[in-house]
């Protein structure tokens, strides 16, 4: 899914100095959270929701190209490589913004960055609507890419810094939820405008009003209090905290923020590549994890869903767009329980389950596609039939009838059909004589649409077509509970607070870069080896990601950030992790199970878990 910088802001769980004293004081009074951490009123919630609208815009822009490409490639007669560039140009802009976005956000503020990204998205969408050439289309997509990358970082940082401690995870997760809702909205839009003349313009234009409204609303929201402290405006920060927490005195939280900012200056960017606190191992774990997020193929399913579904039997634009809408529905349904249950199940467990199910569904998809006798090597070219090409050339040609003239349109369809029936016999004689004006006209139409023979949709068994769609939906669901949201949670936990933001920026750039490479070559690779073998390659990558997660990713459930950092700081962390897994499994699975009372089983489980934790955290290791 989309990379977001899940910056925790001030670590309120276990800070040094003042933070520890504050924690002890409120626990001594019997309260679970300090007063300033409990303040999550309606204003804080509405501010978070307003900022999270950026996620909706990001998801919409990521998903809308799936259906718009079906119309644009015919209108502009795009080649395979040009279609890949239309899709990937957004990622080029996102990659550029990820390299500089952190500096812009720290200099001008999180709120200002969100306002700027919303305005830029509206401008880019306007360029797309008015674009009449391939070059202008690329420029508009790059502008939107810059916008969504900047907003992805700024939104999560802003929400994390205005949210109270015990609601930070929930409020930050609103952005991820809004992203998948945006993807679903894009697929619905694809279906709604699939058969509308110039429907792609409506698809691109729907987000403009929402972007403008968000920019206006964000203008009236307060800046991040953490950003104000960074700029030396402690008085303004205190007022903002009082408004967000509904407290008259926010001195304690302000002290914690200042303390955490001092800790951040202990690390430099280059410490990520040094052995200090085993940071080199941590960044390699992070970079490899985001590599598997992209190399398992999910971005291609997101961008090319309608194209892939069209190649496996959903022949019309409307049918392919409707089927891809199911992808958006599944993403939303799967993301909600993953977000709610991650604190109880654990991110590593979700990653393992997701990778396993992804591999199984991809194998099924590949086998099914092998049995669908279609020309997979032409997936990237236009699949319009000669009938559709002639109809569109008569009805929708420049200066001809509009889509609203139904009576005349039906009349001219009859003329097109008559012309088509008279031209089809001539097509068979082109190779023999090649001397008819009508045959020349037909050849011009054929070259314009890159026509090739495609198997009749009726030749594809309905069972195989729907099994392919079902496998795709299972694959999307598995990604949405595993490699979609969980890597960004893991990345926010394995780095110390003082360097977490820079580590997230680096992994975010890696994520966009690999996404660009994969999306830029998907149609070309599919054109060379076929869709089934692409699925099998993704299967191997999913299994490799499962092995990597099992061996290298720590289970952070129930651990404080300091405990996680302490374990990862060990030089021989990887060796200890593998050995711990084998010993822990031997102890938890007795050779001769015996029936015992539930109380005895609970005591034994607590005993084994206690031994496992002591082994993991012992100084000897």
From Swiss-Prot:
GO terms for biological process: circulatory system development; D-glucose transmembrane transport. It is found in: Cell membrane; Endomembrane system; Cytoplasm, Perinuclear region. It is a multi-pass membrane protein. Its main location: membrane. InterPro entries: MFS_dom (IPR020846), MFS_sugar_transport-like (IPR005828), MFS_Sugar_Transporter (IPR050820), MFS_trans_sf (IPR036259), Sugar/inositol_transpt (IPR003663), Sugar_transporter_CS (IPR005829). GO terms for molecular function: transmembrane transporter activity. It catalyses: D-glucose(out) = D-glucose(in). GO terms for cellular component: endomembrane system; perinuclear region of cytoplasm; plasma membrane. Keywords: Cell membrane, Cytoplasm, Glycoprotein, Membrane, Sugar transport, Transmembrane, Transmembrane helix, Transport. Residues 1-48, 106-119, 163-176, 223-282, 343-349, 492-502, 554-621 are cytoplasmic. Residues 70-84, 141, 198-201, 304-321, 371-470, 524-532 are extracellular. PROSITE patterns: MFS, SUGAR_TRANSPORT_1. The chain crosses the membrane at residues 49-69, 85-105, 120-140, 142-162, 177-197, 202-222, 283-303, 322-342, 350-370, 471-491, 503-523, 533-553. Insulin-independent facilitative glucose transporter. Belongs to the major facilitator superfamily. Sugar transporter (TC 2.A.1.1) family. Glucose transporter subfamily. PANTHER family: D-XYLOSE-PROTON SYMPORTER-LIKE 2, SOLUTE CARRIER FAMILY 2, FACILITATED GLUCOSE TRANSPORTER MEMBER 12. This is Solute carrier family 2, facilitated glucose transporter member 12. It comes from Macaca fascicularis.
């Amino acid at each position: 899914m989309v990379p977001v910088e899940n910056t925790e802001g001030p670590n309120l769980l276990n800070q040094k100095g003042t933070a520890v004293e504050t924690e002890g004081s409120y626990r001594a009074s019997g309260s679970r959270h300090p007063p300033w951490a409990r303040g999550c009123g309606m204003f804080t919630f509405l501010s978070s929701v307003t900022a999270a609208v950026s996620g909706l815009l990001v998801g919409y822009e990521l998903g809308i190209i799936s259906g718009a490409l079906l119309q644009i490639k015919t209108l502009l007669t795009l080649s395979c490589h040009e279609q890949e560039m239309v899709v990937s140009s957004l990622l080029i802009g996102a990659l550029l913004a990820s390299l500089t976005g952190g500096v812009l956000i720290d200099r001008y503020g999180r709120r200002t960055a969100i306002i700027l990204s919303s305005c830029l998205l509206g401008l880019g969408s306007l360029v797309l609507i008015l674009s009449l050439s391939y070059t202008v289309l690329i420029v508009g997509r790059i502008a939107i890419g810059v916008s969504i990358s900047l907003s992805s970082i700024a939104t999560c940082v802003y929400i994390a810094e205005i949210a109270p401690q015990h609601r930070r995870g929930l409020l930050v997760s609103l952005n991820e939820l809004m992203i998948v809702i945006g993807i679903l909205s894009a697929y619905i839009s694809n279906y709604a405008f699939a058969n509308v003349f110039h429907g792609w313009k409506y698809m691109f234009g729907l987000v403009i009003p929402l972007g403008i409204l968000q920019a206006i609303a964000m203008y009236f929201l307060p800046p991040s209090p953490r950003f104000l402290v960074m700029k030396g405006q402690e008085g303004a920060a205190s007022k903002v905290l009082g408004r967000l927490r509904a407290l008259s005195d926010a001195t304690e939280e302000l002290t914690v923020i200042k303390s955490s900012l001092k800790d951040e200056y202990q690390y430099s960017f280059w410490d990520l590549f040094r052995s200090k606190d085993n940071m080199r191992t941590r960044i390699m774990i992070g970079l490899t994890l985001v590599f598997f997020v992209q190399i398992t193929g999910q971005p291609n399913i997101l961008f090319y869903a309608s194209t892939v579904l069209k190649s496996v039997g959903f022949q019309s634009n409307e049918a392919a767009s409707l089927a891809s809408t199911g992808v958006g529905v599944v993403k939303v349904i799967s993301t909600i329980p993953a977000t709610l249950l991650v604190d109880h199940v654990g991110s590593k467990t979700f990653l393992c389950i997701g990778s396993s199910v992804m591999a199984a569904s991809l194998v099924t998809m590949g086998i099914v596609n092998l049995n669908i006798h279609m020309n997979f090597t032409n997936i990237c070219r236009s699949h319009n039939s000669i009938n559709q090409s002639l109809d569109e050339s008569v009805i929708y040609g420049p200066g001809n009838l509009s889509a609203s003239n139904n009576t005349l349109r039906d009349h001219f369809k009859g003329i097109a059909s008559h012309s088509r029936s008279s031209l089809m016999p001539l097509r068979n004689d082109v190779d023999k004589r090649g001397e008819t004006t009508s045959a020349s006209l037909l050849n011009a139409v054929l070259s314009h649409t890159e026509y090739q023979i495609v198997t009749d949709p009726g030749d594809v068994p309905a069972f195989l077509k729907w099994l392919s769609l079902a496998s795709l939906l299972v694959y999307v669901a598995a990604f949405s509970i595993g490699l979609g949201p969980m890597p960004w949670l893991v990345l926010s936990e394995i780095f110390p607070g003082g360097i977490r933001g820079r580590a997230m920026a680096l992994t975010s750039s890696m994520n966009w870069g690999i996404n660009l490479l994969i999306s830029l070559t998907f149609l070309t690779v599919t054109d060379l080896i076929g869709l089934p073998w692409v699925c099998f390659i993704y299967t191997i990558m999913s299994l490799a990601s499962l092995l990597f997660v099992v061996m290298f990713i720590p289970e952070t459930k129930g651990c404080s950030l300091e405990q996680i950092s302490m374990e990862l700081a060990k030089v021989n962390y990887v060796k200890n992790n593998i050995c711990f897994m084998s010993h822990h499994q031997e102890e938890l699975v007795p050779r001769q199970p015996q029936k015992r009372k539930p109380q005895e089983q609970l005591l034994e489980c607590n005993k084994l878990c206690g031994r496992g934790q002591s082994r993991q955290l012992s100084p000897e290791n």
